[in-house]
Amino acid sequence: MTSLGVNIDHIANIRQARLANEPDPVQMALLAELGGADGITIHLREDRRHIQDRDLKLLRETIKSRLNLEMAATTEMIEIALDLKPDMITLVPERREEITTEGGLDVASNAKSLKEIVTKMESCCIPTSLFVDANSKQLEASSKIGATWVELHTGPYARASWKNQPLEFAKISEGVARARNLGLRVNAGHGLTYQNVEPIASITEMEELNIGHTIIARAIAIGLKEAVKEMKELIKNPRHEPFFGS
């Protein structure tokens, strides 16, 4: 069964908008776990626009599920990860001017530096995932540098029109198959919603979906615990089969 990692960055976004103490991402993470979250995902950005170092440390101490730290491949973040020892890190591209992560890592063009990070993390028993687009070039490069995991970027699928969504779904489905053939374990995320998650959750060998914005948006209406329960049920028992021909 596909697991659910709940990204709580948007809780911190609300807090930082007023530079206040609430809402507290740590408290919300615990509610997410009560709702059935299999893991908590956070992105500690270099500019600290939402998640803060304090959040990271408290989450490591308090949550009962897995902590997945999304981070840029920088010296500062590597040192933080080695000190904190999260259950997993996910290396993502990062630009200060972006609102959210806009695309996957170019592993093929940065193989040497990324391999050094992956090797270092794995030697310290920190599993490392690479956030990549679902294409053979990046998947093959990820395998070559020794990564155990990849997280497939589902943004193009999520943004696609109704007409084009089956095509984008096929790319994700084929990406999962290619990754597994290369010996990689596969997660996915970015832009998934209550309306589009079920086909992705139906893909065989998809291990975890990392989802944040749509759950937090839903939580405003019905509460975080119930929002997570609803998403968990969709992933656990998807009613829709994969698109025809995929």
Swiss-Prot record:
- Hydrolase recorded as keyword: no
Cellular component GO terms, alphabetical: cytosol
MF terms (GO), sorted A to Z = pyridoxine 5'-phosphate synthase activity
InterPro entries membership: Aldolase_TIM, PyrdxlP_synth_PdxJ, Pyridoxine-5'_phos_synth
**What catalytic reaction does the record list?**
3-amino-2-oxopropyl phosphate + 1-deoxy-D-xylulose 5-phosphate = pyridoxine 5'-phosphate + phosphate + 2 H2O + H(+)
Give one Pfam family: PdxJ
**Gene3D superfamilies per UniProt:** Aldolase class I
Family that this chain belongs to? Belongs to the PNP synthase family.
- Protein name (Swiss-Prot/TrEMBL): Pyridoxine 5'-phosphate synthase
Q: Which organism is it from?
A: Prochlorococcus marinus (strain SARG / CCMP1375 / SS120)
